[in-house]
């Protein structure tokens, strides 16, 4: 199975130790109207995972020849769930949204994001599932950790949407879960979806990029270097505060992503020396709306289908029109204009021009990434917002409720100094995750940034 350029980029970064994996965690709780407890959670998870795997062939795929100019996918003949799913038990009760952070889950995620998929290569899939069970038998958190060539951030939502449905089906089944299979083979009637190049024309803009102008003093953290140790911390915004923030964004006619990007920029400016005049932000953009696939396939696809844009935010512009301690709306409008310009800059065939199209002209992406070592990075921060975990398609009483969700990832060696990953759960809680590379920014600095973001949202708390 051939790889597209986005998959090749992820494969090269994994091979070089530049990026290990992404993750999406979701908390599941048995409804009070259901049976009092789950007697065999392991069997139930195995049954749900087996059902899901048979529907998503990509989860059997492993990258081959990652460090070469022509990597490709091979398909495992089977997956042993006993080796790919780990069961842990919480040592302390699950933190509530009011407590801002799930430190126990954060520690697990940080460990997972520092573990690649090289061990037992050829026998294990390039994903793993961590089940963190609360004391008692009625709720758990499932963390899906996966290679970026297998899926993007939206794919994490697709996985949990499928897992939630499979969990419900397994709970409703009359078959005993203690007989659930642990060896899962792919359904030969399923296929790996094509790469981006086969579903999108990936047009390259005929316009030349603007000539460089005098650059203000920017901050991008320490230069690009190895080795990479990823650091991680989460922040949960309550449903009431999240809803109030979203409503204010709507009143301002701005997207949540635009506003969040400006919040992070404002907090960074507040924690950086006054001589820092500008910050560049990377914003990933899903290109799924323009893929040549039926909507129902796109919505449930696990694959790599995204692009990214950049916007420069300046301290002067942010402060000149908004003198409040953390003024964000001027910056949010600037981000919004950049997003709209990206979406409106369309090719003759109707799709926006993509920045990832430039990789089509690169024969060996590994060489490109190796050449970045020792050089300054080109962005201060990235904000990835995958939106809302979609509600169940069938509105009927269900045994399992999916609540908090959390998007997470390794630090990217050649990427932005700070990455903020955002997702909103079915319960309305908006979760922000902060990842950074040790040695690129200090832990104390990131603690202040996280606290600054939390302080901004305090005004929305009811």
From Swiss-Prot:
Enzyme class, UniProt record, top EC level: transferase
InterPro entries: Alcohol_O-acetyltransferase (IPR052058), Atf2/Sli1-like (IPR010828), CAT-like_dom_sf (IPR023213)
Enzyme Commission number(s) of this protein: 2.3.1.-
Zinc-finger among keywords: no
Induction: Expressed in copper depleted conditions via the regulation of the macA transcription factor.
Disruption phenotype: Does not affect the production of fumivalines and fumicicolins.
Keywords: Transferase
Pathway linked to the protein: Secondary metabolite biosynthesis
Database matches in SUPFAM superfamilies: CoA-dependent acyltransferases (SSF52777)
Pfam families (alphabetical): AATase
Nucleotide-binding in keyword set: no
GO molecular function: N-acetyltransferase activity
Domain of life: Eukaryota
Protein family (similarity comment): Belongs to the alcohol acetyltransferase FCK4 family.
Function: Probable alcohol acetyltransferase; part of the crm gene cluster that mediates the biosynthesis of a yet unidentified copper-responsive metabolite. In contrast to crmA, is not involved in the biosynthesis of fumivalines or fumicicolins.
Protein name: Probable alcohol acetyltransferase crmB
Gene: crmB
């Amino acid at each position: 199975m051939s790889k597209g350029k986005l998959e090749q980029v992820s494969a090269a970064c994994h091979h070089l130790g530049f990026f290990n994996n992404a993750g999406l965690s979701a908390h599941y709780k048995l409804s009070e109207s259901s049976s009092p407890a789950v007697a065999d959670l392991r069997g139930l998870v195995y049954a749900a995972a087996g059902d899901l795997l048979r529907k998503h062939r990509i989860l059997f795929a492993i990258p081959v020849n990652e460090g070469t100019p022509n990597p490709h996918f091979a398909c495992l003949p089977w997956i042993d769930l006993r080796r790919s799913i780990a069961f842990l038990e919480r040592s302390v009760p699950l933190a509530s949204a009011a407590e801002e952070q799930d430190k126990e889950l954060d520690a697990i995620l940080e460990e997972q994001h520092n573990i690649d998929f090289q061990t037992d290569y050829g026998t294990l899939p390039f994903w793993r599932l961590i089940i963190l069970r609360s004391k008692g038998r009625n709720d758990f958190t499932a963390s899906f950790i996966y290679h970026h060539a297998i899926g993007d951030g939206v794919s994490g939502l697709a996985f949990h949407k499928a897992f939630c449905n499979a969990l419900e089906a397994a709970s409703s089944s009359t078959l005993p879960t203690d007989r659930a299979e642990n060896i899962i083979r792919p359904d030969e009637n399923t296929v790996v979806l094509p790469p981006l190049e086969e579903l999108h024309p990936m047009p390259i803009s005929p316009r030349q990029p603007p000539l460089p102008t005098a650059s203000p003093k920017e901050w991008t953290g320490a230069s690009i270097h190895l080795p990479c140790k990823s650091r991680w911390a989460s922040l949960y915004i309550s449903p009431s505060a999240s809803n109030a923030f979203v409503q204010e964004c709507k009143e301002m006619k701005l997207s949540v992503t635009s506003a969040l990007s400006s919040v992070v920029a404002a907090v960074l400016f507040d924690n950086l020396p006054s001589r820092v005049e500008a910050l560049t932000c990377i914003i990933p953009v899903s290109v799924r709306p323009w893929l040549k696939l039926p909507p129902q396939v796109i919505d449930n696809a696990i694959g790599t289908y995204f692009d990214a844009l950049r916007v420069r935010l300046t301290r002067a512009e942010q402060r000149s029109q908004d003198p409040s301690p953390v003024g964000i709306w001027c910056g949010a409008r600037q981000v919004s204009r950049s997003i709209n310009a990206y979406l409106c800059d369309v090719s003759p065939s109707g799709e926006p021009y993509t920045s990832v199209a430039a990789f089509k002209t690169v024969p060996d992406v590994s060489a490109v990434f190796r050449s970045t070592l020792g050089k300054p990075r080109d962005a201060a921060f990235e904000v990835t917002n995958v939106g809302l975990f979609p509600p169940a398609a069938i509105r009927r009483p269900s045994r399992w409720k999916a609540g908090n969700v959390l998007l997470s990832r390794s630090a990217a060696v050649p990427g932005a100094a700070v990455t903020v990953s955002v997702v909103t759960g079915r319960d309305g809680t908006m979760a922000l995750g902060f990842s950074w590379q040790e040695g690129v920014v200090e832990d104390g600095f990131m603690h202040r940034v996280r606290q600054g973001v939390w302080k901004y949202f305090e005004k929305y708390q009811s």
